[in-house]
Amino acid sequence: MAGIKVFGHPASTATRRVLIALHEKNVDFEFVHVELKDGEHKKEPFILRNPFGKVPAFEDGDFKIFESRAITQYIAHEFSDKGNNLLSTGKDMAIIAMGIEIESHEFDPVGSKLVWEQVLKPLYGMTTDKTVVEEEEAKLAKVLDVYEHRLGESKYLASDHFTLVDLHTIPVIQYLLGTPTKKLFDERPHVSAWVADITSRPSAQKVL
């Protein structure tokens, strides 16, 4: 039976999300590079794996799936007996589900815009829009205020142990720590300690 394959780009935050999950679970996999600058993600054969033309795509033998958060949840459930537990049970699982929604709808869209403006645009020879950065930082600050309160109650966002909720934030945070937006994390003591914790995990270091 064929093993696990991840089709993506190493700089993609969504791809990194999946790779971190696999490293957390100590699961072997094959990484298949999809070159975004050549538009490979919009052509066959990749488009057959994800018709929306976005990385990553994932295969576990005959099982195929896309969308990074769906993939990480599959990994966490399918390999629950391996590596670190990224889930919980009962009411705590509902807290994890809520946290995943908050990260997906509140944290990631804003964080990704800030990564685009401050990291990716300069790489492409484009100019950072400072007005957009200011607007998005104001939005991110509100999300981080919620996180700061939550982290004052528990070590991690959904539990006293590291879960998918924390994992999903890592790729965007890794990029933002190299930008002036880092100040928003540093200004909040609980958030700052949490960021230092999750970004220093071996799984996170492996995707840099």
Swiss-Prot record:
Subcellular location: Cytoplasm, Cytosol
Gene knockout outcome: No visible phenotype under normal growth conditions, but reduced levels of camalexin production during infection by B.cinerea.
UniProt protein name: Glutathione S-transferase F6
CDD domains the UniProt entry points to: GST_C_Phi (cd03187), GST_N_Phi (cd03053)
Keywords: Cytoplasm, Detoxification, Plant defense, Stress response, Transferase
Record Pfam families: GST_C (PF00043), GST_N (PF02798)
Group of enzyme by EC: transferase
Induction of its expression: By dehydration stress, salicylic acid, ethylene, methyl jasmonate, auxin, H(2)O(2), copper, metolachlor, and the pathogens P.syringae and Hyaloperonospora parasitica. Induced by cadmium.
Superkingdom classification of source: Eukaryota
PROSITE patterns, A to Z: GST_CTER, GST_NTER
Disulfide bonds, paired cysteine numbers: none
Stretches assigned to the GST C-terminal domain: 89-208
Residues covered by the GST N-terminal domain: 2-83
Keyword Zinc among UniProt keywords: no
Catalysed reactions, as listed in the record: RX + glutathione = an S-substituted glutathione + a halide anion + H(+)
Gene that this polypeptide is encoded by: GSTF6
GO MF annotation list: camalexin binding; cobalt ion binding; copper ion binding; glutathione binding; glutathione transferase activity; quercitrin binding
Similarity section: Belongs to the GST superfamily. Phi family.
GO CC terms of this entry: cytoplasm; cytosol; extracellular region; mitochondrion; plant-type cell wall; plant-type vacuole; plasmodesma
Task of the protein: Involved in camalexin biosynthesis by probably catalyzing the conjugation of GSH with indole-3-acetonitrile (IAN). May be involved in the conjugation of reduced glutathione to a wide number of exogenous and endogenous hydrophobic electrophiles and have a detoxification role against certain herbicides.
EC identifiers of the protein: 2.5.1.18
GO annotation terms (biological process): defense response; response to cadmium ion; response to oxidative stress; response to water deprivation; toxin catabolic process
Residues holding glutathione: 12-13, 41-42, 54-55, 67-68
Gene3D superfamilies found in the cross-reference section: 1.20.1050.10, Glutaredoxin
InterPro entries attached to this UniProt entry: Glutathione-S-Trfase_C-like, Glutathione-S-Trfase_C_sf, Glutathione_S-Trfase_N, GST_C, GST_Phi_C, Thioredoxin-like_sf
